[in-house]
Amino acid sequence: MLPPALNIPKWLEENSHLLQPPVNNYCVYHPSSPATAGYTVMIVGGPNARTDYHINTTPEFFYQYRGSMLLKTVDTSVSPPVFQDIPIHEGSIFLLPANTPHCPVRFKDTVGVVMEQPRPKDAVDTMLWFCKKCGEVVWEKRFVCTDLGTQVKEVVEEFAADQEKRTCKACGTIAETRYQEGEVVQPPRFLE
């Protein structure tokens, strides 16, 4: 028997405490469940201000349920890399192509849904940090993603705990693990 549809307002009312930093997400449909056909569906809340970029070998589908978010992306096929910010407003959807470095920045009282298709067997995810002074990659970690909810958090914490990993080899700038107050501004469409 199939489960009932998920009512997002009711789920948030009962479970918003599960959206905790540093990732602020909860997998409502886990890929290990036979009913999901390997898909991952997450509810993600704000605020978060992590500076890491994630590379997934499959596309990611974003639906912004409440408020606006900013999806920071990088085109690494050119040198120097080109950084592009994509606002995703309440009620909007966005399909991020596979293998695109991205950093989803969510603001206070915002909620989104992210869906990832099944990863190919032994697909390698990458998390990386760019130097905000020179644009070079400061550090990256590759891993086979078996549990997005825990593995991303572990990599973020590993980077945060090691100043050597956070130091840019090109210019010596120490990378921050969070954006500073006012450094990233919520897209203006739904500001109060």
Swiss-Prot record:
InterPro entries: 3hydroanth_dOase (IPR010329), RmlC-like_jellyroll (IPR014710), RmlC_Cupin_sf (IPR011051). One of its GO terms (molecular function) is ferrous iron binding. NCBIfam families: anthran_nbaC (TIGR03037). This is 3-hydroxyanthranilate 3,4-dioxygenase 1. One of its GO terms (biological process) is 'de novo' NAD biosynthetic process from L-tryptophan. Its EC number is 1.13.11.6. It comes from Aspergillus fumigatus (strain ATCC MYA-4609 / CBS 101355 / FGSC A1100 / Af293) (Neosartorya fumigata). Catalyzes the oxidative ring opening of 3-hydroxyanthranilate to 2-amino-3-carboxymuconate semialdehyde, which spontaneously cyclizes to quinolinate. GO terms for cellular component: cytoplasm. It catalyses: 3-hydroxyanthranilate + O2 = (2Z,4Z)-2-amino-3-carboxymuconate 6-semialdehyde.
